[in-house]
């Protein structure tokens, strides 16, 4: 995991660790300039590793984004940001996206009062995301919320930390996407 971060730069969804200053790939001499192919491949890999997608899943999202109206890149990022695992990460209910996937897979999360165990579930505006009423589920989320640094919450989400409840207000705005993509 850390090799990927060193190679591609900071991936906030994968881990909170940052590459050290001694491992800066820009300081090392590379032969020749970066080709267009290499730049596109690195950006694709950033998306894959940040959101925890397989190649096939990413291709499906690209296909859906290509059919939609508007900028394909922007629509693709909106689709990826509206996944349930990513919304849990943005709400601070999980420290990383893989941690959020585990919460969903282990059936700790309810969307609109129904258990959802699919991390790629596409959330819609006005969806209410809560934890199961079990003590263990609430304890897991409570630990994540207490230990996570309180970053500014995106406009499209609201959280009630006392009831362990999150609300999707609208589709994400492009300025809140935390990943820098060329």
From Swiss-Prot:
Residues 82-143 form the S4 RNA-binding domain. SUPFAM superfamilies: Alpha-L RNA-binding motif. GO terms for cellular component: chloroplast; small ribosomal subunit. The keyword Ribonucleoprotein applies. GO terms for biological process: ribosomal small subunit biogenesis; translation. It comes from the Eukaryota. GO terms for molecular function: rRNA binding; structural constituent of ribosome. Residues 12-36 are annotated as: Disordered. InterPro entries: Ribosomal_uS4, Ribosomal_uS4_bac-type, Ribosomal_uS4_CS, Ribosomal_uS4_N, S4_RNA-bd, S4_RNA-bd_sf. One of the primary rRNA binding proteins, it binds directly to 16S rRNA where it nucleates assembly of the body of the 30S subunit. With S5 and S12 plays an important role in translational accuracy. Part of the 30S ribosomal subunit. Contacts protein S5. The interaction surface between S4 and S5 is involved in control of translational fidelity. This is Small ribosomal subunit protein uS4c. The lineage of its organism: Eukaryota, Viridiplantae, Streptophyta, Embryophyta, Tracheophyta.
